[in-house]
Design a protein with these regions (language model features):
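Membrane-embedded helix-loop-helix hairpins and adjacent transmembrane boundary segments
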Residues: 1-495
Length: 495
């Protein structure tokens, strides 16, 4: 598949020009606007469509166009449980977390980051939880961003023949430009366009493949289908392999309750009306995207036959079905998926460092302008670290990096976010315990028990974090009346 045609190059270069142009536009438009809330949260001005598609696109990394179709192409429909878990998790997050978190964050001293919200929720002057959370953010986002950079490198290497490392450098530089210049507004608007592109690519490709396969001149490739390929129970029955795949797949849904770059989209929505619109759009988008991604994997096996790398099934189908320029546009959807996730992760880690480490610890009297530049510098540093992780041949690949980071966030922050929104007895000490225990159990399980048990580490990490937060809260002094009063009025509509 080595060399891209001129049509594909034109389409990909136009895509790059678009995302850079968005960053430049918002830099020029907002260059006189001061305030960390504007740069890191877009001034809480996002409409329903932009917020919903930005949340979806920043969530669905290149995994949805490479990892999921590839795993279903190779192993069969039994691998669909991750997609089912993600759909359930997305719907639950939009319904049970998004509106309450937005309202509570406004009333909790207008918090603009998740660590800031957790601290303000307890009206605490102790910055320990805020700092611990921000450190976890920066560490895990280095790993998560590496998966997106790796995906860009894989695509460019496959389509153009360019070396993977060179491609990673180019992708990292482009992401840096529009995040550095435009901040949250640029990230959300590029995510909006990228979300639309991903949807179009996943809708068009399998539908056209079906039409081609029904043609009289289509000769189906001969390819053996593995045992249980069309069985939703990957182990062929109700055995531990099937159950662990189902539990682990559904467990991915728990990650949404603690995913900072998705949660911050909820904070940015400008009104109650736009929130309701976002809920409908966000849930519908994720359902269609994941369903069509699975269909690509199933149809790809019948359409393509044997291919060398299963995670390139979407790439092969697009290049075989469409003329060069359209092929380039649709292949840009993979770049869109990777870059929309990376930009959101970089901005979330940037805001966490500036608001939760730089100002509370390093320079307490830092101005808004200075904090913006502190955030921009950390974006560069994290990008460099993420590049070296992605370039390491022993990093484990896109799926391994995503699994690791997703579980880390879900285990550390998922239980605490849910308890902070639904349990007025949660204490500051309980929240600290939940974050620390969830993160440590997740890391230990990943290192020593994940392979032998077949159970995804987010399950034990989330449960242990939840138990730790509840036990420590019950053993510590009850929250003050001021804290419980804030909790009681936090969920009244804001407009």
């Amino acid at each position: 598949m080595g060399t891209a045609s001129s049509g594909e190059w034109i389409a990909i270069l136009l895509y790059f020009a678009l995302v850079i142009g968005v960053g430049v536009y918002f830099f020029i438009r907002d260059r006189h606007v001061e305030g960390e809330k504007e740069y890191f949260l877009g001034g809480r001005s996002m409409g329903g469509w932009v917020a919903a598609l930005s949340a979806g696109a920043s969530d669905m990394s290149a995994w949805v166009l490479m990892g999921l179709p590839g795993s279903i192409y190779l192993y069969g429909i039994g691998k669909v449980w991750i997609a089912v878990g993600l759909v359930i998790g997305t719907i639950c997050a939009w319904v049970f977390v998004a509106p309450r978190l937005r309202r509570y964050s406004i009333r909790a001293n207008d918090s603009i980051t998740i660590p800031q919200f957790l601290t303000n929720r307890f009206q605490s002057k102790n910055k320990g939880l805020q700092i611990i959370s921000a450190i976890v953010f920066v560490v895990v986002y280095c790993i998560y961003s590496a998966s997106s950079i790796s995906a860009c490198g894989t695509l460019f290497n496959t389509v153009t023949g360019m070396s993977a490392k060179t491609a990673m450098i180019i992708a990292t530089a482009i992401i840096l430009v529009y995040v550095f210049l435009g901040g949250f507004n640029a990230v959300c608007w590029t995510d909006f366009f990228q979300g639309m592109l991903m949807l179009a690519a996943l809708m068009l490709t399998p539908i056209l493949a079906l039409f081609v396969m029904k043609g009289a001149d289509f000769v189906a490739p001969v390819m053996a289908v593995p045992e249980n390929y069309y069985n939703v129970l990957s182990g062929g029955g109700f055995n531990w392999k099937s159950m662990s795949d189902i539990i682990s797949g559904l467990g991915w849904g728990l990650g949404y309750f603690g995913m900072p770059h998705i949660l911050v989209r909820y904070l940015s929505i400008k009104s109650e009306h736009e929130m309701r619109k976002s809920q409908i759009i966000g849930c519908s988008w994720i359902l269609v995207i994941l369903a069509m991604s699975a269909v690509v994997g199933l149809i790809g096996r019948q359409f393509l036959g044997e291919i060398d790398k299963e995670n390139l099934v979407f790439v092969h189908m697009v290049r075989r079905l469409f003329p060069a320029f359209i092929s380039g546009v649709l292949l840009s959807a993979i770049l869109a998926a990777a870059m929309s996730t990376a930009d959101s992760q970089l901005l979330a880690s940037s805001s966490a460092f500036a608001s939760d480490i730089y100002k509370p610890v390093i320079r307490k009297d830092a101005t808004d302008h200075e904090m913006q530049w502190a955030g921009r510098i950390i974006v560069i540093l994290i990008s460099v670290v993420a590049f070296f992780i992605a370039a390491d041949p022993n990093c484990g690949g896109i799926m391994a990096l995503v699994e690791c980071a997703w579980a880390g966030f879900g285990s550390a922050f998922g239980p605490v976010i849910l308890l902070s929104l639904y349990w007025r007895r949660l204490t500051y000490s309980g929240a600290v315990a939940g974050v620390c225990v969830g993160f440590v159990v997740d890391a230990v399980w990943y290192a020593f028990l994940s392979s032998s048990t077949g159970l995804y580490e987010i399950i034990p990490g989330f449960l242990c974090g939840l138990i730790a937060a509840v036990i420590v809260s019950l053993c510590s002094k009850a929250p003050s009346k001021e804290i419980t009063d804030l909790f009681d009025r936090a969920f009244e509509p804001t407009d």
